[in-house]
Amino acid sequence: MSTLGDLLAEHTMLPGSAVDHLHAVVGEWQMLSDLSFADYLMWVRRDDGVLVCVAQIRPNTAPTVLLADSVGKLAGPDDLPVVTMAFESGAIGRGSDKAGQGSRTRPGLDVEAVPVRHQGQVVAVLTHQTALAERRLTSPLEGAYLDCANDLLHMLAEGTFPNIGDLAMSRSSPRVGDGFIRLNEGGEVVFASPNAISAYHRMGLNSELDGHNLVAITRPLISDPFEAQELANHIRDSLAGGSSMRMEVDANGAAILLRTLPLVAGGKSLGAAVLIRDVTEVKRRDRALLSKDATIREIHHRVKNNLQTVAALLRLQARRTSNEEAREALIESVRRVTSIALVHDALSMSVDEEVNLDQVVDRILPIMNDVASVDTPIRINRVGNLGVLDADRATALIMVITELVQNAIEHAFDAKTEQGCVTIKAERSARWLDVVVHDDGRGLPVGFSLEKSDRLGLQIVRTLVTAELDGSLGMHDVPSGGTDVVLRVPIGRRSRGAQ
């Protein structure tokens, strides 16, 4: 399915600022849909007059009347005359979709077309559809919602709503159903939804909201006087026609998220809307998660310290032993333990249980050169980015890469080689991480088989690749000289044995 940006690029020549404005409209129109109890479609017009639906939203507060997905559908100018008229006149119009062209589902819809103005030009038209047969007397809540929606739609037609700077704010704001308060131009509450009243009672309010000045009734409830003053300034700024504001406050042990929306028509303030949500339980869960994350990071830190202690003891024992074979085995163990310790070190500083593989590999490579048991100087390079991998598989992959590099250092070069080179080549796609460990040495021995090799390092590699990484591994000579070890690992969390 094409995105809004794709459809705008395909069918229009709108400048970047207009495209950003339409993205901002889409960022806010779930609120419009919920306030209007209506489905919304966004239409743009091609040079030949054909209308293209580029976005669609359905309400959370009412049943949808548009059962089909209309995004990408085309309509002629005569199919939706109310939309064509809105493009040409720049004014809000009303009509009916008797043939069902706009909905692609059923006829008999009441359609209101609202021009979206940006820098004085109509760049799109929003239509919101409601069923003609479902008109009835509205409740006070529905009336307050519809009045606010009407004000916002007129601001949309004037080009004063939304503000592009509010796009990020809209993604984390309270929803209409969480709690809604309507203020008049003097800052007095003219309507408060039941959820908004409950949120204020949670804050410690013992009286009703209706008829009271919201700033005066809210300030005493907030624990921090600086937060209270900041919220008061936000509300006053919105009443004066300023920008939308979002703020979280603590009151009487409750965490409350508020967003203020200025309502302005023709340059005159109509008051403000306040969306409010009780996020006390959400904050409690966030704190619990942060505590668990800190505990996990502390565990990784202690594991790293213990592994470093083990590596130090093995290194000390390697220095004291007189048996060369035992010394080499101990040094290999030091390298393996150090590799795992570096992964836990990275996890101890990560907040999302993911490891930057490039950073860990770059720290391991110098260590491998230091503990190499060959006299030939070896240069180790990394080309490309390994990227980030989840903690479950990062340790196994780091172990595999270090074993393959160590195997190349120890077995790829003969004593006459002046200098060897081992290169780690990484290429990452959406599904796969491909790693090639290349050396410019003498190539594989005659009759060598990866599956039948009795080298401990390669046995470890085979086990990790198949059992832990669900990947594939291959080794072959390179015509220009040397050997390539090719490793492919799925990036997604696939079950073992998945194709």
UniProtKB/Swiss-Prot annotation:
Autophosphorylated. It is an enzyme of class 2 (transferase). GO terms for biological process: phosphorelay signal transduction system. It is found in: Cytoplasm. It comes from Mycolicibacterium smegmatis (strain ATCC 700084 / mc(2)155) (Mycobacterium smegmatis). The lineage of its organism: Bacteria, Bacillati, Actinomycetota, Actinomycetes, Mycobacteriales. The modification Phosphohistidine is found at residue 301. GO terms for cellular component: cytoplasm. Member of the two-component regulatory system PdtaR/PdtaS. This two-component system plays an essential role in mycobacterial adaptation to poor nutrient conditions. Nutrient deprivation results in increasing intracellular concentrations of cyclic diguanosine monophosphate (c-di-GMP), which binds to the PdtaS sensor and promotes its autophosphorylation, leading to the activation of the signaling cascade. The phosphate group is then transferred to PdtaR. The keyword GTP-binding does not apply. SUPFAM superfamilies: ATPase domain of HSP90 chaperone/DNA topoisomerase II/histidine kinase. GO terms for molecular function: ATP binding; protein histidine kinase activity. The keyword Nucleotide-binding applies. Its EC number is 2.7.13.3. Residues 4-149 are annotated as: GAF. This is Sensor histidine kinase PdtaS. Gene3D superfamilies: GAF domain, Histidine kinase-like ATPase, C-terminal domain, PAS domain. It catalyses: ATP + protein L-histidine = ADP + protein N-phospho-L-histidine. It comes from the Bacteria. The gene is pdtaS. Residues 298-493 form the Histidine kinase domain.
